[in-house]
């Protein structure tokens, strides 16, 4: 399939459409594991959460714990219950499961005045935080691109940011959001924004 782009090309990433909710947000220094099949999504979510004061446990520690327990977490055939169990073993309270669905096409870009072929993408990023002890989903967010884009790393990062911002209540669900939430060109949340007040939670929830 060959698509065509007008004057603006595919470089600019439009504000994605989002949905999300939270029942409670993590207290500062909550330990979490970000788990998913795409390293770029995991990295973007980890960076965003670190900026919000969440302590992110590296996936390699979970994989090591799984190897010690002779549990397979590689590929796409793993059980989420095993991930939760291994995350608990390494001291995490939350597992943030990330999922990205990416489609790609060859497109003709006329933005320079001359047609040239390039690969463009559309994507949906979904994340949800699960308590390792109770299995409760504490928050969940999803962001879907509204236009095709050419920079897959920037696109996935921006979608991850908007999905998380919606889950945490920093932007409303839908297709409209302040530019300061996830500034274009950065793909990461603005550091100028003050974090929301975390919901009151039992003292034990931060462990």
What is the predicted role of each segment?
Residues 76-84, 107-116:
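N-terminal post-signal-peptidase region of extra-cytosolic proteins
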Residues 47, 69-72, 110-111, 142, ...:
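Surface-exposed beta-strand edges and their flanking turn/coil or helix-capping segments
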Residues 1-30, 40-41, 86-90, 102-105, ...:
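C-terminal/domain-edge helix-coil "capping" segments
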Residues 28-99, 132, 136-140:
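N-terminal segment of the mature soluble domain
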Residues 92-113:
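Charged, amphipathic alpha-helical segments
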């Amino acid at each position: 399939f060959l698509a065509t782009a007008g004057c603006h090309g595919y470089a600019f990433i439009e504000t994605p459409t989002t949905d999300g909710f939270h029942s409670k947000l993590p207290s500062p220094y909550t330990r979490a594991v970000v788990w998913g099949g795409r390293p770029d999504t995991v990295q973007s979510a980890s960076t965003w959460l670190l900026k919000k004061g969440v302590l992110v446990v590296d996936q390699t520690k979970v994989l090591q714990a799984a190897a010690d327990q002779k549990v397979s977490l590689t590929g796409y055939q793993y059980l989420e219950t095993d991930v939760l169990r291994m995350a608990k073993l390494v001291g995490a309270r939350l597992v943030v499961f990330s999922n990205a669905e990416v489609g790609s096409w060859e497109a003709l870009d006329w933005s320079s005045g001359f047609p040239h072929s390039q690969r463009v993408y559309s994507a949906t990023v979904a994340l949800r935080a699960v308590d390792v002890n109770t299995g409760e989903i504490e928050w969940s967010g999803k962001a879907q691109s509204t236009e095709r884009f050419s920079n897959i790393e920037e696109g996935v990062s921006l979608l991850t940011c908007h999905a998380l911002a919606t889950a945490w209540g920093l932007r409303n669900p839908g297709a409209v959001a302040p530019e300061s939430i996830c500034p274009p060109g950065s793909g990461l949340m603005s550091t100028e924004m003050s974090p929301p007040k975390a919901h009151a939670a039992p003292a034990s929830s931060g462990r």
